[in-house]
């Protein structure tokens, strides 16, 4: 094997380690880096929390009450979802500075940046946000009305290019939920209620973002919310205690699973379980991420999914905005007990959490085997290597960003786009259970 004459000496030891060698197999690089990581570094990698572009030494007004430097340098966190963002050009410059700070840490593990949708007209933190400089497209429900896989895949390809231009490598979407409860507030983030349509468009969406597979030019999709967030009891919000239950009066739990198998076949490597409790569907009425029958038995074993399972945001500890932890069904457990239960269920990463200390303490206290952390960290490292972040996490000038916008690849409502007649009335389909979730 040829030895590179130049390399990124990420651990600053003056020699080429296997994990720094781009010519070695990914699995070999993963194992080498894993062997060099401390317990604290492993626990930090399992956090996936919010960050606001800006100064690294200022506590932001919204999000975790801790500086970016503290999270990256001292807590060893290297997965972040961006909240508010300046223009695309400013975001790209900030991203490179963030990667430079990560490069200077002990092992130089690069940052993975994720985001909720950035291409719609709404501006709702935690659901979808506009970003100046990106092209504008319909919400997923609008794509559902168009019903064209080619249009959705084209959108995904354009959005992929725009995400790459500013450093976003994980899309916290698509939503593969079936909106069978018309009062549910997240309907606009879905492709609709009809499983066949949602299945086709979800797979097309993933193909657009990931291409032939997640690599240096792909954006990894985190499909959500397994096993389907649509049957929300009374349409209430599962972020809150009063909306923690999912109901299936039509006994259609299996119907809501239909889009996920094809999503995995399309290459989705990350999954986010839903907040809610699937009432009466498993032996224990607890939230999805705490439910071993949902995560291990259904997702891991039945579907054979071996990718990353990242919880929805704030299921273990609450945030400073006054929202309690969404630990539905296990509210009585301590923080450490909640971590143990989710790990036993089979999750890999914790959305919205920025305190890795309880995980490390569980190992120190003899209540958790470090090998269990290794299992999840392997998955997280593997994806970073596949995306090429260890070889070059930085991005170049974004002066060509407008070339990716609608003028080059026009959305279907622009005059230059081909027209497609859509029937003014769409009869209900027998396969859709509608509100009978």
For the regions a language model picked out, list residue spans one by one:
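Glycine-rich tight-turn/loop motif centered on a GG-T
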Residues: 81-85, 131-150, 182-201, 235-254, ...
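Short, acidic/polar
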Residues: 58-73, 151-159, 250-262, 332-339
């Amino acid at each position: 094997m040829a030895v590179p004459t130049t390399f990124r000496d990420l651990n600053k030891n003056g020699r080429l380690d296997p994990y720094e060698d781009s010519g070695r197999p990914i699995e070999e690089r993963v194992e080498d880096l894993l062997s060099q990581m401390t317990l604290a570094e492993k626990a930090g990698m399992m956090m996936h929390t919010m960050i606001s572009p800006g100064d690294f030494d200022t506590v932001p007004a919204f999000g975790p009450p801790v500086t970016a430097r503290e999270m990256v340098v001292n807590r060893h966190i290297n997965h972040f979802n961006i909240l508010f963002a300046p223009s695309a050009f400013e975001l790209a410059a900030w991203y490179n500075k963030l990667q430079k700070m990560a490069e200077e840490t002990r092992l130089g593990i690069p940052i993975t940046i994720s985001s909720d949708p950035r291409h719609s007209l709404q501006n709702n933190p935690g659901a979808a946000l506009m970003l100046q400089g990106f092209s504008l497209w319909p919400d997923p429900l609008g794509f559902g009305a168009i019903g064209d896989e080619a249009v959705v895949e084209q959108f995904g390809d354009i959005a992929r290019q725009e995400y790459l231009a500013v450093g976003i490598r994980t899309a916290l979407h698509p939503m593969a939920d079936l909106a069978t409860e018309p009062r549910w507030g997240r309907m606009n983030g879905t492709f609709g209620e009809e499983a066949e349509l949602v299945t086709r468009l979800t797979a097309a969406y993933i193909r657009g973002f990931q291409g032939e597979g997640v690599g240096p030019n792909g954006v990894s999709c985190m499909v959500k919310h397994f096993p389907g967030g649509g049957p929300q009891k009374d349409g209430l919000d599962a972020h809150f205690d009063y909306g923690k239950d999912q109901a299936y009066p039509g006994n259609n739990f299996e119907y809501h699973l239909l889009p996920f198998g094809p999503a995995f076949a399309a290459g989705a490597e990350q999954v986010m379980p839903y907040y809610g409790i699937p009432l009466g569907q498993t032996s224990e009425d607890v939230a999805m991420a705490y439910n071993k029958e949902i995560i291990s038995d259904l997702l891991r074993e039945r579907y054979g999914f071996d990718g990353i399972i990242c919880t929805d945001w704030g299921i273990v500890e609450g945030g400073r905005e006054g929202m309690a932890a969404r630990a539905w069904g296990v509210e009585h457990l301590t923080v450490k007990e909640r971590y143990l239960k989710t790990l036993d269920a089979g999750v890999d990463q914790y959305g919205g959490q920025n305190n890795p200390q309880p995980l490390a303490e569980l190992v120190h206290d003899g209540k958790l085997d470090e090998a269990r952390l290794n299992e999840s960290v392997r998955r997280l490292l593997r994806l970073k290597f596949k995306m090429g972040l260890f070889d070059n996490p930085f991005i170049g000038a974004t002066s060509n960003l407008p070339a990716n916008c609608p003028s080059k690849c026009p959305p279907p409502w622009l005059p230059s786009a081909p027209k497609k007649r859509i029937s003014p009335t769409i009869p209900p389909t027998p396969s859709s259970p509608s509100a009978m979730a």
